[in-house]
């Protein structure tokens, strides 16, 4: 994939590697080269964990994994867990949100015995915010949020809050308690503010980098040579930043883009504080 004049062929984090190719034959050759390089240093690729994920325009030909003794056809998948985050061929974030919800409940239930035995409210709140909230929002720096996804996160967090303070949904309704009332009782962080703060913090790091990393290049990339799909353009990661942070005049014309503001660390920290009150 060509991005701003450079070819993006792989992503690497420790021994977790993604190869990016425009044709299955190219992918097979790249895999063979990787196998060869790994064997030179005594490493082997796990064929059981190596899968093929394609977009809807990809050639359906099979990808093969070769070794000196045998050749294996790799399985195609519609989704894959990479670095703890589920990615899929449709760029749909909802399955990952469901995973985060399950992870948050697992974290809550796993720490329940500890929190139930603690009477100090401040410690209980700190445990919740440091164990359950990160499980619910893991990887949220890279989320492209819309109202439906935000509501899913908010509802899950509200359920966890009720469990923390010992109130069921029925009891909440009988006592005519609103979301704000439960928040006063729980004193935990607001999840959507927490997500926004993490995203803004990450956006600032990306904008200020000057070492040519792919995260920055992909954020700035405009694929002018690609045709747009028919229909409404999917929401992009930077759309919320343009809408909420970019400054405009009375006619809606851009005065200062968010990426320019983010290059000034002090000014960006002020932006984060203004946009994430009480997070």
Curated annotation (Swiss-Prot):
Q: Which InterPro entries match?
A: DNA/RNA_pol_sf (IPR043502), RT_dom (IPR000477)
Which Pfam families does the UniProt record give?
RVT_1
Superkingdom of the organism of origin: Eukaryota
Q: Give all residue intervals belonging to the Reverse transcriptase domain.
A: 1-87
- Would you tell me the protein name for this molecule? Putative uncharacterized transposon-derived protein F52C9.6
Source organism per entry reads: Caenorhabditis elegans
Q: What is the lineage of its organism?
A: Eukaryota, Metazoa, Ecdysozoa, Nematoda, Chromadorea
């Amino acid at each position: 994939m060509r991005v701003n004049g450079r070819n993006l062929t792989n992503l690497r984090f420790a021994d977790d590697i993604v190869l990016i190719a425009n044709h299955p034959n190219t992918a097979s050759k790249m895999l063979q080269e990787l196998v060869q390089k790994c064997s030179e240093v005594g490493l082997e690729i796990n064929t059981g964990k190596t899968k093929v994920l394609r977009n809807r325009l990809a050639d359906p030909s099979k990808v093969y994994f070769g070794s000196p003794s045998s050749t294996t056809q790799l399985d195609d998948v519609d989704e894959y867990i990479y670095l703890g985050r589920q990615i899929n061929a449709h760029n749909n974030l909802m399955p990952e949100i469901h995973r985060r919800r399950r992870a948050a409940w697992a974290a809550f239930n796993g720490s329940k015995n500890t929190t139930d035995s603690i009477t100090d409210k401040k410690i209980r709140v700190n445990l919740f915010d440091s164990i359950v909230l990160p499980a619910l929002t893991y990887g949220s720096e890279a989320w492209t949020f819309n109202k439906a996804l935000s509501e899913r996160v908010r509802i899950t967090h509200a359920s966890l809050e009720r469990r923390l303070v010992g109130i069921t949904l029925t009891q909440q309704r009988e006592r005519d308690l609103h979301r704000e009332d439960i928040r006063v009782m729980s004193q935990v962080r607001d999840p959507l503010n927490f997500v926004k703060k993490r995203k803004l913090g990450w956006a600032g790091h990306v904008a200020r980098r000057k070492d040519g990393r792919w995260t920055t290049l992909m954020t700035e990339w405009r694929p002018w040579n690609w045709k747009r799909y028919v229909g409404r353009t999917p929401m992009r990661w930077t759309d919320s930043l343009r809408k909420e942070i970019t400054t405009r005049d009375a006619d809606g014309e851009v005065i200062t883009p968010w990426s320019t503001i983010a290059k000034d660390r002090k000014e960006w920290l002020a932006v984060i504080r203004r946009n994430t009150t009480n997070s």
